[in-house]
């Protein structure tokens, strides 16, 4: 099966415990490698500049860059200051928008990091795709005079979307509501699966049922990319099995496996065997409730 991913590859400067590590990042990388680990072909729609020195590393992991991915402008670059379980995000450079024509992929992940996807592209994918996973973070982000990223309320058409992943802040800036009320509001806007991630507590709303899962307590290190791993695992599992409950267990199992590595950057991406073990355990511990 083939998965199309629309997002920037980034250069992430990760600052933690007094050290700064430079690593490739972005949903294009995290989702792409996760999908490859799950035996999917990946159709990568991204842009990188001449300063992106990690192309060979990603190609060795199975990702392919088209000629259209090359830009003369710098690669999108972030500084991530990790402060316990919280983080501050700063934009240091922004690459070109992604130009999208078409793809015969079985499913799409659209996960912009900052202004690389137009609403016109969003509309095209919404109309053309059978499965559409959407992470809206890049549409909600703004930048202040210091480069620090913050979120702002944004009117966005999210109809005809198969699944959306939001955290509490993103859900609030999309709906003006919190928790279950925000999830119901997103569903009413036309989303089939609402995936609400609040640190180690994850809730999925499908039809009139809520599914609650919990990642075991642990010391949390670098969380960069965990949400992307989650999105890719849900998407690949759902495309293979067409089972919403198993897909959310697989997604949470992938996030748990990534966190358990305690690794920085792409090294935290788990293999499918470990994800499968976690998912099987989670499947028997899901809590259900009616909306």
Per-region residue spans from a language model:
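Alpha-helix C-terminal capping segments
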Residues: 32-41, 237-240
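Short catalytic helix/loop segments, enriched in acidic residues and glycine
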Residues: 20-33
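Conserved phosphate/ATP/ADP-binding segment of small-molecule kinases
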Residues: 141-212
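Short glycine-enriched, charge-decorated loop/helix-capping segments at active-site entrances
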Residues: 17-23, 147-149, 180, 218
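Active-site metal-binding loops of divalent metal-dependent hydrolases
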Residues: 7-9, 229
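Conserved post-catalytic alpha-helical subdomain immediately downstream of the catalytic base
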Residues: 193, 216-286
């Amino acid at each position: 099966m083939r998965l199309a991913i629309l997002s920037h590859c980034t250069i992430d400067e990760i600052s933690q415990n007094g050290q700064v590590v430079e690593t490739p990042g972005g949903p294009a990388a995290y989702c792409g490698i996760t999908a490859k680990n799950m035996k999917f072909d990946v159709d990568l729609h991204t842009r990188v500049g001449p300063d992106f020195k990690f192309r060979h590393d990603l190609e060795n992991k199975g990702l392919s860059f088209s000629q259209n991915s090359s830009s003369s402008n710098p690669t999108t670059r972030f500084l991530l200051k990790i402060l316990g379980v919280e983080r501050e995000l700063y934009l240091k450079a922004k690459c070109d928008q992604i130009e999208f024509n078409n793809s015969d992929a079985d499913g799409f992940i659209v996960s912009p990091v900052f202004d690389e996807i137009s609403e016109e592209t969003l509309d095209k994918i919404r109309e053309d795709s059978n499965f559409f996973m959407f992470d809206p973070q890049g549409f909600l982000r703004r930048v202040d005079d210091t480069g620090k990223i913050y979120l702002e309320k944004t009117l966005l058409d999210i109809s005809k979307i198969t699944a959306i992943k939001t955290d509490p802040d993103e859900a609030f800036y999309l709906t003006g509501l919190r928790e279950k009320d925000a999830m119901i509001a997103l569903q009413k806007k036309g989303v089939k699966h609402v995936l609400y991630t609040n640190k180690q507590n994850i809730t999925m709303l499908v039809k009139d049922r809520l599914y609650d899962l919990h990642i075991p307590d642990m010391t949390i290190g670098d969380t960069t990319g965990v949400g992307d791993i989650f999105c890719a695992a849900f998407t690949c599992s759902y495309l293979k099995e067409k089972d919403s409950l198993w897909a959310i267990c697989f997604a949470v199992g992938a996030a748990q496996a990534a966190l358990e590595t305690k690794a920085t950057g792409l090294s935290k991406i788990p293999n499918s065997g470990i994800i499968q073990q976690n998912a099987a355990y989670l499947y028997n511990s899901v809590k259900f409730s009616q909306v």
